[in-house]
C-alpha cells in the first residue's frame, strides 16, 4: 500500500482476567494474544499489530485493509481473547473471560462485550496517531478531553492560529440510552454540544470529523471513541466499560501536544471501585497502569504511533512517561485522598440512577414495607 490509500486502524480491548483482582494483565495473556495476531499477520489478515494493557484490560492495536466492522478482524480479536481466556482460567485469574458476554462469535464483536474503536482513513504523507486506553471508567470520560482537543482554543492554539483548523470540527454525539445520535458543528453549536456532553453518563462523543473545505475529507473521522456499555449488554454489572480512543494529529489537526494537553488536568470520571464512584483520571505510563488504591484511581495510557506508508505501526511511544505529567499525577493523588474521605456518600459514590446494577435496588426492596408516609 502507499500514501493516499485507505487503511483501517482497530483498537479492540477486553477484560479477560485480572492479576491479582482487577489490577493488571498477566504477561502470559499478552503472549497468547501476540501469538494469535502474529499468525494473522503472516497470513496477511492484518498488516501490523501491537498488544498492550491498561489495568486488567488486554488491548489489541491492529492495522489492516478490511475496513471497520470487518468479520475477519473482529473474529481475529475474539479468537485472541478466547486463547488468552483459556490461560486466565488455567491460572484462576480473577474475572476470567468476564468481558466475553456471548458464547460464540457471530460475525461482529459489537454487543458481545469487548470495547472497539476503529477508523478507516486515507493515509497522509505523515500519519501520527495516539491511541488512548482507560481503565476503571466509562466512555463519557473522554468527553472533556476530546472536546478540549478539537473545540477549546485555550487548549488547542491551532483553532485560533492554524488556517487549516480555524473553521472548526463536527462532533458525532451518541445518546447511549435512547440509541440515537446527532452531529453538531463547532464553534457555532458549541453551547449545544456542551449541554449534551456535560451529561457524560448518557451523551458521549463517538467521532470527530473535519468540516467541508478541510484537507481531510469531511466523512473521514479524525477521532473515534469506544461507546460499549457492558451493563446494557449483560443486564447486570460485570465491570466498567474501560473505553479506548484513536486520535489523529498534526497537519490541520491538533498537534501532538494539543492532543495530550487535556490530560494535564485530572478531571473527575465515573467508575473506580465497583464501577460506582467518582474520582480523578490519572495519566500514567503503561507500566504504571495498575490500579490499586480502592481499585484506582482510574488510569489513562497514551501510546503514540506513526503509520508508515506500508501501514506498519511505528511505535509505541509511551507518551505519559514524562515528568511533564508529574503534576497531573500528584494532583490526581490529592483529589483521590480528598474524595475517598467521603466513603459511601455522594458525590464520591455515584447518584442513585447510576447504581441500578448494585445491591442498592435489593436494599430498597427489602425495606419497602417499612417505609411509611410522612404526614
From Swiss-Prot:
Catalytic activity, reaction form: beta-D-fructose 1,6-bisphosphate = D-glyceraldehyde 3-phosphate + dihydroxyacetone phosphate; beta-D-fructose 1,6-bisphosphate + H2O = beta-D-fructose 6-phosphate + phosphate
Record has Membrane as a keyword: no
Binding, Mg(2+) 2: 56-57, 135, 242
Binding site for beta-D-fructose 1,6-bisphosphate: 22, 94, 107-108, 136, 250-251, 274, 295, 357
Enzyme Commission no: 3.1.3.11, 4.1.2.13
UniProt subunit comment: Homooctamer; dimer of tetramers.
Role according to the record: Catalyzes two subsequent steps in gluconeogenesis: the aldol condensation of dihydroxyacetone phosphate (DHAP) and glyceraldehyde-3-phosphate (GA3P) to fructose-1,6-bisphosphate (FBP), and the dephosphorylation of FBP to fructose-6-phosphate (F6P). Can also dephosphorylate, with lower activity, other related substrates including fructose-1-phosphate, fructose-6-phosphate, glucose-1-phosphate, glucose-6-phosphate, glycerol-2-phosphate, phosphoenolpyruvate, 5'-AMP, 6'-ADP and 7'-ATP.
Name assigned to this protein: Fructose-1,6-bisphosphate aldolase/phosphatase
Natural source organism: Thermococcus onnurineus (strain NA1)
GN (gene name): fbp
